[in-house]
Amino acid sequence: MIQGTLYIVSAPSGAGKSSLIQALLKTQPLYDTQVSVSHTTRAMRPGENQGEHYFFITEEAFRQMIDNNEFLEHARVFDNYYGTSRKVIEETLASGVDVFLDIDWQGAQQIRKKMPSARSIFILPPSKEELCRRLRGRGQDSEDIIEKRMDQAVAEMVHYNEYDYLIVNDDFNTALADLHTIIRSERLHRERQAQRHDALISKLLAD
């Protein structure tokens, strides 16, 4: 079985990473690509569903999972905890499915230490002004929260140079095409292709 690839995707809030990942998944078979569903202690937003967008749990339950070493990574962001189940990720990758992790730079650093083979992608907005406009356009946060998110955005973007790939989400379709290109190139990597075409290569090299 060909091991799936773990993709780390990070961006400041409002840069469009979640929309890009969801658009990508609509074009990929479920047996090829899945998105990781994280655990979080933050409140559920309108339109979100338990187990689909996040596993919403109490802070007490989250801390218990930390004590049990059940997370591949976890971090505290905007006064809430977020974490990724180690077991789910490892089992999914072992089945040959690529997994996307929508996490911040703190989680990305933890993942890279534990899974050096993971590929990382950072998504930038075209400008601070556009980022602020997008945050206001969501209609989910107060001005105080938006201001806090803008401050956090700068702190997040400082870490762009820790990632393998960089995408600027100015035009959505162009950014999506860039994301497709990254996935396609990784699937054409020699190691994965050699596993996929092992029988063919053996025949070609046979005396």
Swiss-Prot record:
Region forming the signal peptide: none
Catalytic reactions of this protein: GMP + ATP = GDP + ADP
MF GO annotations: ATP binding; guanylate kinase activity
EC number: 2.7.4.8
Protein location: Cytoplasm
EC top class named in words: transferase
Residue ranges crossing the lipid bilayer per the database entry: none
Record keywords, A-Z: ATP-binding, Cytoplasm, Kinase, Nucleotide-binding, Transferase
InterPro entries with a match to the protein in the record: GK/Ca_channel_bsu, Guanylate_kin-like_dom, Guanylate_kinase, Guanylate_kinase_CS, P-loop_NTPase
Pfam families (alphabetical): Guanylate_kin
UniProt domain Guanylate kinase-like: residue ranges: 4-184
Iron recorded as keyword: no
Cross-referenced PROSITE patterns: GUANYLATE_KINASE_1, GUANYLATE_KINASE_2
Binding site for ATP: 11-18
Coiled coil: none
GO CC entries: cytosol
Top-level taxon of the source organism: Bacteria
Role this protein plays: Essential for recycling GMP and indirectly, cGMP.
Membership in a protein family: Belongs to the guanylate kinase family.
Annotated protein name in UniProt: Guanylate kinase
Source species of the chain: Photorhabdus laumondii subsp. laumondii (strain DSM 15139 / CIP 105565 / TT01)
